[in-house]
Structure formats: structure tokens, C-alpha cells
Amino acid sequence: MNNSSELIAVINGFRNSGRFCDIDIVINDERINAHRLILSGASEYFSILFSSDFIDSNKYEVNLSHLDYQSVNDLIDYIYGIPLSLTNDIVKYILSTADFLQIGSAITECENYILKNLCSRNCIDFYIYADKYNNKKIETASFNTILLNILRLINDENFKYLTEESMIKFLSDDMLNIKNEDFAPLILIKWLESTQQPCTVELLRCLRISLLSPQVIKSLYSHRLVGSIYECITFLNNISFLDESFPRYHSIELISIGISNSHDKISINCYNRKKNTWDIISSRRYRCSFAVAVLDNIIYMMGGYDQSPYRSSKVIAYNTCTNSWIYDIPELKYPRSNCGGVADDEYIYCIGGIRDQDSSLISSIDRWKPSKPYWQTYAKIREPKCDMGVAMLNGLIYVIGGVVKGDTCTDTLESLSQDGWMMHQRLPIKMSNMSTIVHAGKIYISGGYNNSSVVNGISNLVLSYNPIYDEWTKLSSLNIPRINPALWSVHNKLYVGGGISDDIQTNTSETYDKEKDCWTLDNGHMLPRNYIMYKCEPIKHKYPLEKTQYTNDFLKYLESFIGS
């Protein structure tokens, strides 16, 4: 006798011939003979049953008629060394039986089989099963598979068997794999139609209402399973009072723009969620000290230096939808560098900077509307400056800090509207070269230079400005002081990355924890190179449907974009 497998084979031979068998498992009219000792060694259920007062020690049979005979028989064979023969059709029955009999190794083997074979064709079936039998491992895996394949599953025959509670979980999840929020109501409507169940307010609350197009909102109003429910109509009538929603994880692409070594190319990088790395998707010959603005998913780069010693008036752009460069854009009114860039729904703005002729500071704000042949002067800053923070919030252009005459930083904060300039609460410290972002109705700035006289102190400060109360709040400082970093917001979280620290460009990133008010180094968003950063922008996926007129079959039209 060399090993345990040979021993179990001999014992199985005894079972087949009836030798030493001391128990019969009875299931309806079927009997399975076995040995108490062997069953007790493999099954916690049998171990407790045979070593307690559950049955008379002299009794030679156990009735398990509430279980599936074939599954019990397969598991008894498994205990006696015969491998399980698993398929998608039978694995659920064997797993639930193994779970009842508490045969740990069989449970693990069945779970591993399901996890290995889990796909869009069976994930709903396994999710319903796991939910019923409280198997968290399979439930989590199948839940994530449904999230990933949700648009493929809305026409699956099992889609209608998902419960309202399950649909609330799916529709609420940030990881729901849709590239545009308009697809979430489509998922909801397809489920309502398959179940013929009227909509509820709880289901509508799962949608990111503020991100929906007017056409889809109209589709919700007009659908019989939504529009006929008074509570649902009341909810939709009050959507203007709902808080702003954050896009789902898959509905945006995170794009960064930067340069690494001197005279290196401009790099356009896209964040790869699966690998937690940045992929360089395009590059273009060297340019530095330019302004960046994003409009309609096109990244515009204005002015700066190229490989010549002179400032440039050229404007180039990168289309994130077509992954192509655009060069036929009207030039700025004159060459400039170290300027600021923002955009509203119509215009791109180039603000301040340094002029090429005599390196004088610029006060003009020029703007350009795509399709127009030239740039126009829109306004002038009160004090000429460069390297300031700029932001567009609530239709106002904010200009923050910057470098003014005498190479000193300033602490001014002013906003421009159609009525002119307005001064606001000054910065707590004079700053320039910081990164700026609008997040959750506030302006955030981080890093840069700070000094009351000569520009020379690298900052790790992070500040937020509340326009309602006209006040600045100091947040926890960055771990690494840096100038010209990128500050960005994704899924209600703040990140900062790149820039220059101690005269060396860095590729490190940090994440802000709002509850703990602290920044932590974030290896997941570490940049591919040491970058001076010009922008890190979440790009929302757009579809042609956004400019389509509403029709009664708009949701069917929307469905035609699945897979595109």
C-alpha cells in the first residue's frame, strides 16, 4: 500500500461489494450503502449525525429524501475517491448538497468550477442561485460579471428573474459598465418591460438624474410603467432639486497631458483601469509653458515655446474621440506663454501670460469659438500677470494668484462675469504655478510657488474656495511639495500628480481622503514618466444621440448604440 489514494480505492471496493458497510442513505426509493467512519471523516454533517443522539447507533439507515439523489450519490462517490464530473447544469445542485452535508473540499471544488466558468451567459443564473443560498463568494463574482456585461444582458431570458432589490444594487453601483448615463434608464426600462412591474421611486433614485439627457428624461415621463405612477412623476418633477451626480467609473476616460525631459515630446496619456497604469496614446513634438483647455472632448494647447527660443501663437488640439491631432486652428492674436486656459460651453479662453516681444506681462483675455476664423479680445485682467490659477465655475472665470510685476506672487482672487470684475477673499498666502480644479461646487488649488517677495518657495499647500461663503479653507498638505502638478477629480475623489519637486520632475501621485483630511501616496496612479503636468482631465464619453431630437422610440434608438 503506497499512498492514501490506493487505500481509498480499496475501501471503495469494499463499499461496492457491500463489505463492512454499516449505513444506508435512503432517498425516496433509492439506497446508497456506505461506511459511517468514512462519511464522518469527509462530512461534518455525518460526523455530527453519527456521533450524537440524532439517530440510534444501532440504526442502519438515514433518510435524506429532501435532497437530490444524483447529487448525493455523486458526493458519496467523491468521498470514496471518484472525481466529480461537473457541468454548468449540475454544479449548482452538487454545491448546494455539498453545502448541506458540509463537505468542505467538494464545496471548494464546485466554487472554483463556477468562478472559472463564470461568463455573460450564466452570470445571472449563478447570481440568483448564490443570492438564494447566501454564497457570498459566488454572489460577489457573478454580481461583478453582471455589472461588466449589463448592456449585453438586458435581452437575456433570465434578466426578468432579477429582483427589484437586485436591480437597485446594480443601478446604484459606480462600476455599472456604461459609457453614458443615458444607458442606465434603458437598463431600468428593459427590466420593467420584461417583468411587467411598475416603476418605483427607489429604482429612479438609482439613476444619476443630473447626468441624463433631456431626451431620456422625456422617455421616462412617457413610458407607461413609469409615467402612470404618481410617485414617480412627482419625483421626476423635482429633479432640479437633486444634488449633482458624479459619473460612473466606466463613463469617463482619464487623460493627462505633460512633458518629461527638456525638449521631450508632449505626451497624451490615458489611464488603464485594468492594469492601474498610464498608457501613452499619442505624442507630438516638444512644446512647453502652454495653456490647456478642454471643450467637447477636444484638448486645446495654446501658445508656449517650441524648440525655438521664441514664444508661439500657435494653437493645436487633440481629439480624444478620434485619437487624432488638429492643426488647422486660428492662431492667438500674438505669441504668449505661461498663460491660463479655460472653457465654457461655447468658448475657449486664453488668459494673461508673457508676451514674446519684450517679455512683458499680459492683461488681455482672448477667446475663440470653434468654427470661427479668429480670436477676439474678451476682457482684461485688472493687473497683468502670468502663471496664475484659472477656473470656470457657475459661468464665472476665476483668476487666482499668479506672478505680477517684479517677479512676485500675488494673493488676489477675482472673477469675471458679463457685468465685469469682482474681487473676492484673498488667498491666505501669495501663490503662483499651482494646479487648479473645480470639484463639488468649490475651487481647489494645490502646490506651486508661495512667497511674499521673490518667487522661490515650492509649496505643498492645498486650499479650497467656497464661492457661496467667499472663504478659503486650508486642507491637509501634500506629502511632496511640487510646482506645476496636475490636480484632478474622479468619482468624488481628489488626486494630484507629477510636477517639479526639489528641482526634479516627479511621477508620483497622491490621493485625498476627505474623512481623514490627509493625502496618501498613490502607486495606482503613478505617472509613466517624471512629468511637468499641464492637465489631467476626466473625459466623458459622448454619443451622437446627444444631438438627436426626441421621438417616441428614442430608447430603441439608444439601444442601437450598444457595442459602439
Swiss-Prot record:
Residues 123-219 form the BACK domain. Probable substrate-specific adapter of CUL3-containing E3 ubiquitin-protein ligases which mediate the ubiquitination and subsequent proteasomal degradation of host target proteins. The BTB domain is responsible for the interaction with CUL3 while the Kelch repeat domains supposely serve to recruit the cellular substrates. This is Kelch repeat and BTB domain-containing protein 1. The gene is KBTB1. It comes from Camelpox virus (strain CMS). Kelch repeats lie at residues 252-297, 298-346, 347-395, 397-441, 442-492, 494-539. GO terms for cellular component: host cell cytoplasm. Its main location: host cell. PROSITE patterns: BTB. Keywords: Host cytoplasm, Host-virus interaction, Kelch repeat, Modulation of host E3 ubiquitin ligases by virus, Modulation of host ubiquitin pathway by virus, Repeat, Ubl conjugation pathway. GO terms for biological process: symbiont-mediated perturbation of host ubiquitin-like protein modification. Interacts (via BTB domain) with host CUL3. The keyword Repeat applies. It is found in: Host cytoplasm. Residues 21-88 form the BTB domain.
